[in-house]
């Protein structure tokens, strides 16, 4: 297991109370040896005006996953901040849920890179993101 902090899924989800994460309905669903996953509903909260998943909502899910994964890689007295987010949208989603899968690309002492892939309910890739974070403290 790569994580330096050990939290349960319930504890991870509790951190989202009264935040954008909760407003968008994002729920952490899996914390594996080197993977963090979450789901987000595709509904009125996350739609753009034409009834499709808003790219900004996809980006919010990606940044949520990458930032929390980055936090889990820090020690006491440290935190992470996002420095760059890139998102490539591959396929439209109009309903259901999307699942985000976050994996490390680089875990340095001062910076990290994460790949976050979003999948629709049929398991099709709908968005690929990369998040860069800086380790502070």
From Swiss-Prot:
Active site positions: 63 (nucleophile or proton acceptor)
Name of the top EC class for this enzyme: hydrolase
Pathway per the UniProt entry: Siderophore biosynthesis; enterobactin biosynthesis
Keyword Amino-acid biosynthesis: no
Any one Gene Ontology BP term: enterobactin biosynthetic process
Sections of the chain in a coiled coil: none
Pfam families: 4HBT
Single GO MF descriptor: 1,4-dihydroxy-2-naphthoyl-CoA thioesterase activity
GO cellular component, one term: cytosol
This enzyme's EC code(s): 3.1.2.-
Subcellular location: Cytoplasm
Keywords: Cytoplasm, Hydrolase
InterPro entries: HotDog_dom_sf, PAAI_dom, Thioesterase_EntH, Thioestr_dom
Keyword Cytoplasm: yes
Subunit and partners: Homotetramer. Dimer of dimers. Interacts specifically with the aryl carrier protein (ArCP) domain of EntB.
Annotated family: Belongs to the thioesterase PaaI family.
Function as written in the Swiss-Prot or TrEMBL entry: Required for optimal enterobactin synthesis. Acts as a proofreading enzyme that prevents EntB misacylation by hydrolyzing the thioester bound existing between EntB and wrongly charged molecules.
NCBIfam families from the UniProt entry: PRK10254.1 (NF007607), unchar_dom_1 (TIGR00369)
Name of this protein: Proofreading thioesterase EntH
Organism this protein belongs to: Salmonella enteritidis PT4 (strain P125109)
Taxon lineage: Bacteria, Pseudomonadati, Pseudomonadota, Gammaproteobacteria, Enterobacterales
Gene: entH
């Amino acid at each position: 297991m790569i994580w330096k902090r050990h939290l349960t899924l319930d504890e991870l989800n509790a951190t989202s109370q009264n935040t954008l994460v909760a407003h968008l309905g994002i729920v952490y669903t899996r914390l594996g040896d080197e993977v963090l996953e979450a789901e987000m509903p595709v509904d009125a909260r996350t739609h753009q005006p034409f009834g499709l998943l808003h790219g900004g909502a996809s980006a919010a899910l990606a940044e949520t996953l990458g930032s929390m994964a980055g936090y889990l890689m820090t020690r006491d007295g440290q935190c992470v901040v996002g420095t760059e987010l890139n998102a490539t949208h591959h396929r439209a989603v109009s309903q259901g849920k999307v699942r985000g899968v976050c994996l490390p690309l680089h875990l340095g002492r001062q910076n990290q890179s994460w790949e976050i892939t979003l999948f629709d309910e049929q398991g099709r890739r709908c968005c690929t993101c990369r998040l860069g974070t800086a380790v502070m403290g």
